[in-house]
Curated annotation (Swiss-Prot):
Complex I is composed of about 40 different subunits. One of its GO terms (cellular component) is mitochondrial matrix. Its cofactor is FAD. It is found in: Mitochondrion matrix. This is NADH-ubiquinone oxidoreductase 40 kDa subunit, mitochondrial. It comes from Neurospora crassa (strain ATCC 24698 / 74-OR23-1A / CBS 708.71 / DSM 1257 / FGSC 987). One of its GO terms (biological process) is ubiquinone biosynthetic process.
Amino acid sequence: MAPLTAAMRSTPRIIVSNAFGFQRRAISDVTITRTGKPIIRNQGGRSSLGGHTATVFGATGQLGRYIVNRLARQGCTVVIPFRDEYNKRHLKVTGDLGKVVMIEFDLRNTQSIEESVRHSDVVYNLIGRDYPTKNFSFEDVHIEGAERIAEAVAKYDVDRFIHVSSYNADPNSECEFFATKARGEQVVRSIFPETTIVRPAPMFGFEDRLLHKLASVKNILTSNGMQEKYNPVHVIDVGQALEQMLWDDNTASETFELYGPKTYTTAEISEMVDREIYKRRRHVNVPKKILKPIAGVLNKALWWPIMSADEIEREFHDQVIDPEAKTFKDLGIEPADIANFTYHYLQSYRSNAYYDLPPATEKERREDREYIHML
């Protein structure tokens, strides 16, 4: 097998010229995975054949669509375990016919999890919760759910397992979200030592709970004066990093902290949001001792997400970056700054008063005077 593999890797690039004189470059290669499975590598493309078979748990969430899209357009077969029929429909068109496979599963059903991973050579676990519900607690999702997925990965000897955790993951944290995320990391590493751990900072994008939350009229009550500090990261950058980890086996057994280039407080981001939407959102600061129990009651009494006691606790924890963890720099990625994307993601929140604002620049004033006679 070794001489054959070496011969395939050394195959020269084939250049084909058509009748019009244009050159079409065809590159083919064979990669042998850790378990000896041959993977046909090519230039990629939506309709290309070969490539990896990847299972993406949590693909229907904010981060999931970005990694599914990147894998599918490279010719990979993507298996998407889902719970809700309506939440997964938009993912079907991210890949060519037959490249995106949907499998219904239950996080408490080991058989459905094993069915989702048994044909794959890479598994992504993006499952997580920002708040507990009556059906799933933080421990159910971040620890027990991750444990079942890791056991299925180990049972079928999957080549790569990439587990997405969270920034500030600490088993001794007073915040249950951070504590369960850290214990989940320990569990998956004990079952599958070659697990790649990814800890993204608070992410911003089209479906985020950062920019859109600050732009919403419902986000009124805070407890720490919005003074918590963190490095917000673009969700597209995180998706690109997850894709590159698949192609680079040196990322196995490593821990990555993925965060943006600048540190902001929530108050600073809120000011950027207000400037972008031409509105002033009101925020009322309530002491932690009062707001935390109220948030806990609302989380249990209402069936739609408003706030939870753990989210209030999270406001008092600044982001702490692990100096020993690898970052975007080790993947050759330059993370984007949130200040460059506020208009892109928040333009739909703009007030109609925007159209009545006076010209802002001298050029706009000249154009305004030029066409004023048409009004």
